[in-house]
Amino acid sequence: MTKRRVVVGMSGGVDSSVTAWLLKEQGYDVVGLFMKNWEDDDDGEYCSTRQDWIDVVSVADLIGIDVEAVNFAAEYKDRVFAEFLREYSAGRTPNPDVLCNAEIKFKAFLDHAMSLGAQTIATGHYARVRERDGRFELLKAFDHTKDQSYFLHRLNQAQLSKTMFPLGEIPKTRVREIAAQIGLPNAKKKDSTGICFIGERPFRDFLNRYLPTKPGPMKTPDGKTVGKHIGLAFYTFGQRKGIGLGGSKDGSGEPWFVAAKDIASNTLYVVQGHDHPWLRSRELVAGNVSWVAGEPPADGARCGAKTRYRQADAPCAFGRAAQAGDERFSLVFDEPQWAVTPGQSAVLYDGDVCLGGGIIESAATGRAGTAPAGRAPALVEAR
């Protein structure tokens, strides 16, 4: 009887390594595939590609599977990084890991795996796939503290039907135990953090290599200039560190936060205090939508939503756009949400089931009547 072939995306980390081992133990014909998605820093201090490949080969030798490397750097630059720069240039804060999953790991990678004769692909993501009544559902991981369904919400039925997440039912602590028990050479390797192509390097330094600085005024809600920014692209809503402002003598003395960007005047608005009304939103509008089931929830449906990773699901009401052909949606939250950021993803849930979501275009904050005379700075609007 021919074994079912599964191609596992292997990064050199513990999660994907244990994924490959588990599937091999379950009797699958496992092939490891290492993706190289970034080439600009092959010799830089922050590039770990060479060591990651060495770790992949070592793990493959130990568990007895074939492994190969594939270069998706061109696809990544075209489908992910170019959009990343466009969004930052427009003053928004994108999440490239969401786009990378949809366009690279579960599209380019999936296509390549099928060319190798695979019936299924698998990754080390913490999430689950469930088939019900002929449809595939994306669910949160058993270990909610490690759940990554937020980053996977743009996957469609075709992609989910060919995907396995073996770690979805396993706590992260158990994954580490398995790695140590079977003697994986990377058992103590730290989890990767940060945006995949940036790694551990200072984000502002990285962004400055691709986007020019464009200094402008930094103002308070009443129009007072309190400093100068280096360029709107280098700041995000709710940001506290790196603003360059201490507590002012005539202010509250509380920390400063980025609260709004006025693209037309190149002005960055800052406020003092974590609970300032400019940082709180009860409503948002999102576009560029993607629904796991292929269609949105019913108008007025109750659901939970995340506007950032690791955020607890916030109860809200879902609203469809009134105009025919407009796929955007609105969310009205039961409680104000903090620093809802244009460019980030609003992801909807029905319990553990991820419904999909969209890219945040705008959010209504408590700013009425507080803007400088003659101009109320609007949150950045997506195209």
Curated annotation (Swiss-Prot):
Gene3D superfamilies: Adenine nucleotide alpha hydrolases-like domains, HUPs, Translation factors. Its EC number is 2.8.1.13. InterPro entries: MnmA-like (IPR004506), MnmA-like_C (IPR046885), MnmA-like_central (IPR046884), MnmA-like_central_sf (IPR023382), Rossmann-like_a/b/a_fold (IPR014729). The gene is mnmA. It comes from the Bacteria. It is an enzyme of class 2 (transferase). Pfam families: tRNA_Me_trans (PF03054), tRNA_Me_trans_C (PF20258), tRNA_Me_trans_M (PF20259). The record marks H125, Q344 as: Interaction with tRNA. This is tRNA-specific 2-thiouridylase MnmA. It catalyses: S-sulfanyl-L-cysteinyl-[protein] + uridine(34) in tRNA + AH2 + ATP = 2-thiouridine(34) in tRNA + L-cysteinyl-[protein] + A + AMP + diphosphate + H(+). One of its GO terms (biological process) is tRNA wobble position uridine thiolation. Belongs to the MnmA/TRMU family. Residues 95-97 are annotated as: Interaction with target base in tRNA. One of its GO terms (cellular component) is cytoplasm. The active site is at C100, C196. Disulfide bonds join C100-C196. Keywords: ATP-binding, Cytoplasm, Disulfide bond, Nucleotide-binding, RNA-binding, Transferase, tRNA processing, tRNA-binding. GO terms for molecular function: ATP binding; tRNA binding; tRNA-uridine 2-sulfurtransferase activity. ATP binds at G9, M10, S11, G12, G13, V14, D15, S16, M35, G124. Transmembrane segments: none annotated.
